[in-house]
Design a protein with these regions (language model features):
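Membrane-helix interfacial "entry" motifs
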Residues: 1, 5, 9, 74, ...
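Hydrophobic alpha-helical transmembrane segments
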Residues: 10-15, 35, 57-61, 76-80, ...
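Short helix-perturbing small/polar motifs within transmembrane alpha-helices
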Residues: 13, 80-121
Length: 170
């Protein structure tokens, strides 16, 4: 965990929170394009957690508070899926290795999606789940979570390695 002074902590946290809110709320303001930007909302929180775990947690909660003002449904989805995914990836990727990070981070959105579907009843998830049997729905959610977590972990690892190389060059 990197030590940060308070000014850097606040500035970096604010920038990453802003990026995460923009990406997560993109489907609200740009319905077609926003669906492609929304998955990128995991990356700012993961970057914050890689840099400093308390920073990742602060960004996570400030992200939820700001997003609640914009759209409560997006905030709930964030709380149980992409937000926790970012925290898990950021905490484990460079501390425990990519395999542990992929396995742990794929469980989080899987359980979150099941919770959003069967406990909270988010309409988009309920409509999808009603089209299939429960076992098939669970399998689809797990497969999607595993693929999504895998892509996020690999992309983030390559991105951080690229930034590290840039820092060494300059």
């Amino acid at each position: 965990m990197n030590k940060m002074n308070i000014s850097s902590f606040i500035c970096v946290g604010g920038i990453l929170t802003t990026l995460a809110v923009i990406f997560q709320s993109a489907p609200v303001f740009l319905p077609a394009i926003g669906l492609f930007l929304s998955p990128l909302s995991t990356l700012p929180i993961a970057i914050a957690a890689i840099s400093n775990i308390p920073l990742g947690i602060i960004v996570f909660f400030s992200w939820i508070l700001i997003l609640t003002i914009i759209n409560i449904q997006e905030s709930i989805i964030l709380l149980f899926t992409t937000g926790l995914l970012g925290i898990i990836i950021g905490t484990l990727l460079f501390r425990k290795g990519i395999i542990i990070s992929i396995l742990s981070s794929s469980i989080t959105p899987y359980l979150g999606t099941i919770f959003l579907t069967y406990i909270i009843g988010i309409p988009a998830f309920v409509n999808l789940a009603s089209s299939f049997s429960t076992a098939l729905t669970f399998f689809i959610f797990f497969l999607f979570s595993l693929i999504y977590a895998n892509i996020c972990n690999i992309f983030l690892k390559k991105f951080i390695n690229y930034l590290t190389k840039l820092k060494k060059i300059s």
